[in-house]
């Protein structure tokens, strides 16, 4: 199945694109998506560990199942003072 990934801030810079289309096996989870992204761009692995997945406007846990052609936005935490 294909998943459309919307990358924000530093992740878009690491992957050199604001959007990616990732092929995953049927029954894949958000954790599987993170793993595939880390394989694709190993330098992004540390940022992916803290990224929040958003699907259909709500938080998606790492064990949540993904569906074909679903869009997943990956948000990095904001820090500062």
Model-derived features with residue positions:
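Ubiquitin-like/PB1-type beta-grasp interaction modules and other compact soluble beta-rich domains
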Residues: 1-80
């Amino acid at each position: 199945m294909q998943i459309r990934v919307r990358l924000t801030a530093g992740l878009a810079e690491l992957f050199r694109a604001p959007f990616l289309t990732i092929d995953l096996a049927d029954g894949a989870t958000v954790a599987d998506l993170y793993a595939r992204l880390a394989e694709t761009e190993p330098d992004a692995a540390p940022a992916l560990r803290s990224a929040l997945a958003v699907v259909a406007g709500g938080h998606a846990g790492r064990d949540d199942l993904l569906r074909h052609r679903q869009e997943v936005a990956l948000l990095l935490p904001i820090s500062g003072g």
